[in-house]
Amino acid sequence: MNRKKPELLILLKTHWLWIWFWRVTLVVSLSYAWYCFYVPSNRIVWADNYTSAQSQSAQSGKPMILFFTGKWCVPCKVMKRNVWADDQVTKIVNSSFIPLTIDVDDPDHAAILTRYNNDNGVTPITIVTDPNGNALQWRVGGIGKSEFLELLRASNPSAINDL
């Protein structure tokens, strides 16, 4: 009986530490989950499908931007928050490009994945094409705003005059 009493006292003295530990862990975990999965809306005018995007691109002479993504892709969500939602990017993309998102999990996009050598469904991939759909520039993986603007500049220098 005497042995259990000191153990109980030790447990009671350290109990509040464990409560705070789990509270802090919960707050940090929820914050990280919100950061990874929160994606603000953006004002980019996305094309409905590849055929219509290529048709618009051919008629306007503007290059296409293909963004290969998936609902489960955390780096894609970070790009959507940090790159696609940016006002400068929105202005440039809407005025000088035809943007199209391609969900790698959609079976209807299998031909597009094959055409751009993404049969494995790697995400995120950003490809800039000419009006005929030929790849001009591409980046694999999540990229920041400055690298994205350099990608656009390399493929269509006239689109980014004020950088």
Feature names for model-found ranges:
Residues 1-44:
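N-terminal targeting signals for export/organelle localization
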Residues 18, 73-76:
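Disulfide-bonded cysteines in secreted/extracellular proteins and peptides
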Residues 46-63:
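A short beta-strand-turn-helix
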Residues 54, 87-156:
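Thioredoxin-like thiol-disulfide oxidoreductase module
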Residues 60-73:
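Short active-site neighborhood of thiol/selenol oxidoreductases, capturing the structured segment around
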Residues 77-81:
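Detector for the c-type heme attachment site
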Residues 157-163:
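Short, solvent-exposed mixed-charge patches
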